[in-house]
Amino acid sequence: MSRVAKMPVAIPEGVEIAIKDTQINVKGALGALALAQNAHVVIASNDGKLTFVPANDSRQANAMSGTMRQLVNNMVVGVTKGFQKKLNLVGVGFKAQAQGDKLNLTVGYSHPVVMAMPAGITVATPTPTEVVIKGSDRQRVGQIAAEVRAVRPPEPYKGKGIRYSDEKITIKETKKK
């Protein structure tokens, strides 16, 4: 059995989990999330904890039990605390502006880049060079953050561009004559 799947998922107060034959629904203070259930994993609920057991002894069932456990745990954390990604804009004249569900980026192009945020994702700009993306779905928060970063990824010679706040950019040395 997978090491990750051996750990049960604790269900905190205010979180409702409904396990149907094809879907797992998690509802909490920050919203509701759904996940398709895998046929290789048996999910049992007892005493406020969820346990994940492989349905058979195959390698795929063993691997999927750990994967399903972690996905459900991310859903529980998402509907209670939520997830966030911080991005920094580095460069002269680079700035961001949040306008409702849109993010307006001025990052050195001849035109501003306007990105619409999907439902369930909120964007904030505490400073003009900082963007905070929040939501209850970890995968969507990471995907939107990656799409914002892809507008102007950091370049290796000066480090200008949009980067994650915890990202380290190694600066290359320029060509010498």
Curated annotation (Swiss-Prot):
It comes from Polaromonas naphthalenivorans (strain CJ2). One of its GO terms (cellular component) is cytosolic large ribosomal subunit. Disulfide bonds: none annotated. One of its GO terms (molecular function) is structural constituent of ribosome. This protein binds to the 23S rRNA, and is important in its secondary structure. It is located near the subunit interface in the base of the L7/L12 stalk, and near the tRNA binding site of the peptidyltransferase center. It comes from the Bacteria. Belongs to the universal ribosomal protein uL6 family. Pfam families: Ribosomal_L6. NCBIfam families: L6_bact. The keyword RNA-binding applies. This is Large ribosomal subunit protein uL6. Keywords: Ribonucleoprotein, Ribosomal protein, RNA-binding, rRNA-binding. The keyword Protease does not apply. One of its GO terms (biological process) is cytoplasmic translation.
